[in-house]
Amino acid sequence: NLNKNKKETIFNHDLKINSEKYLEVTNKLIPTGKIKKVKNTINDFNNFQNIGEKITIIKNKKIKRVSNTINQLGFDLTFCIKKNSKNYLASLKNKKTNIQLDFYSNLPGVQLYTSQGLRYKNKLAPYQGVCLETQHYPDAPNNKNFPSTLIKPNKLYKYFTKINIS
């Protein structure tokens, strides 16, 4: 949450994700193995999009999202990152506070979670946080069309995530 008052929602945050595809999931949020295109869908964040507007569209159109497991609507989805030389992943900004986070990683995916299910001892409420979690594709060992997560002996693996704050 990039607001000064952390009790405010993330509805005034804008998000951009370097992705043309996302992982389809079951109603239990398990990847089906299908990779879907984001173009012309509610999941398209290729240009900065307001998170609050996207969630409002989901609610108003009553789009059934698989993340609606606890009667809340929002995002809980893995995006497949487009490969690029600078490892650019995503940007999150708040125009009101003028804070921006730019994410870089060599991992192939990022999980977007808009905290629709967030409840913590009356201190946190739904939509008071947003998570961008760099990762391999969930359930990759069971989906041969996903990038491999097999770790071989005597081979060095280096993964990084970098966040620039401005």
Language-model regions, residue ranges each:
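An exposed, glycine/acidic-rich loop-and-rim segment of catalytic or binding clefts
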Residues: 1-166
